[in-house]
């Protein structure tokens, strides 16, 4: 069984995705055993799907992806008092799959949010030898409060799928989760190339939208 796109894994699970957003930003969710069990069940299904998943490696701007996700989480969690801070200076490009990496990072951030003992989660992009990676630092332990550890197994499998690595460094007060991916010598499209692509899309879609919906992009 081959899945060409990671989105195939989530076919028919839109309702669960909405619940997961509530799970991510509602600490009281940890007391809802029924929903927690469902979350673990879906993770087990995804772990099985990952064994058969195939995809074409792509060049991923890891620093931009990490920053965007961290900022979004910080905004969404602002009312809870938990802050997500991104630290990263230079761009780093890796070979992998942006959707898989996004899912893995969200899993780590949700662990840090739900089980962290401090109201601060620090996320940074790092460089180690021939790899670039993401480091998530929070107070407390990612594993001591977990009933199954499926989430971390999910992250580990994603890293292995992209020829990367995943490991955890723990002290008495903090947990550091690190995902590493092989560096890419390729560069993503430049800002000028992206602007040209967006302009082309706009020029082609705008007349269609006016004709079909009576609306126009601005």
What does each model-identified segment do?
Residues 50-55, 93-96:
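Conserved micro-motifs of the catalytic ATP-binding
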Residues 56-71:
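A conserved beta-strand-to-alpha-helix junction within the catalytic ATP-binding
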Residues 101-102:
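A residue-level detector for a conserved hydrophobic packing site
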Residues 161-218:
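Flexible, glycine-/charge-rich segments associated with ATP-binding catalytic modules
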Residues 83-92, 137:
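Conserved catalytic submotifs in the C-terminal HATPase_c
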Residues 132-150:
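Glycine-rich/acidic phosphate-handling loop/turn and adjacent ATP-lid/helix
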Residues 120-130:
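Short beta-strand/loop element within the Bergerat-fold HATPase_c
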Residues 111-113:
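Short helix-loop "hinge" at the ATP-lid/N-box region of the Bergerat-fold HATPase_c
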């Amino acid at each position: 069984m081959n899945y060409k796109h990671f989105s195939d894994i989530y076919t028919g699970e839109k309702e669960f995705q909405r619940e997961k957003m509530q799970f991510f930003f509602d600490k009281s969710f940890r007391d809802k055993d029924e929903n927690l069990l469902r979350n673990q069940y879906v993770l087990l299904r995804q772990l099985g799907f990952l064994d058969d998943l195939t995809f074409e490696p792509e060049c991923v701007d890891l620093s931009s992806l990490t920053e965007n996700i961290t900022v979004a989480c910080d905004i969404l969690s602002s009312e809870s008092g938990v802050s997500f801070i991104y630290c990263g200076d230079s761009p780093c490009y890796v070979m992998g799959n942006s959707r898989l990496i996004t899912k893995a990072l969200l899993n780590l951030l949700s662990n840090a949010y739900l089980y962290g003992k401090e109201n601060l989660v620090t996320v940074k992009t790092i460089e180690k030898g021939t790899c670039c990676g993401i480091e998530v630092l929070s107070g407390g332990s990612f594993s001591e409060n977990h009933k199954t550890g499926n989430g971390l197994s999910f992250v580990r499998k994603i890293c292995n799928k992209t020829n990367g690595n995943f490991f955890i460094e723990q002290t008495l007060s903090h947990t550091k989760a690190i995902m590493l991916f092989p560096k890419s010598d390729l560069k993503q499209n430049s800002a000028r190339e992206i602007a040209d692509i967006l302009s082309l899309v706009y020029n082609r879609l705008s007349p269609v939208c006016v004709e079909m919906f009576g609306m126009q992009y601005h």
